[in-house]
Amino acid sequence: MIILVPAEQRLSLEGRIRVFELVPDPVTGDERLHRHGYSYCLDLAGGILAEYEPDELDQVTNSIGEPYAVYVSCQSMDAARTFLRDVLPGVDGLVDTNHFEILPASRFLALMGRHPEWDWRRQPSTDLQ
């Protein structure tokens, strides 16, 4: 999943994440996090934006302006939900599920609250009521 915020909010988002005591991964250059029994790999450099299709990047830019992105990978949906519940409250940005949806962070959190077992890899938000 990818968390996107306006570029001017980069330090704020990084600060939220770095408070969790990340450790460098000597192999990938990314950062690792072990929290609540889960492992995460994070790319805080923003390089994931280079992988966006032009129309996706336009969608993001039209919504939040010049973006900054954090790529987060983890081992399970429970891990993903836990991380997002810890990081997203108060974030004025977007969540890219990496499964064809980019949603406002507040809406994403609301959907997780109403549908605690939601698996966005298999079910688009438009299927939720």
What are these regions (language model features)?
Residues 1-129:
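Acidic (Asp/Glu-rich) sequence patches and key acidic residues
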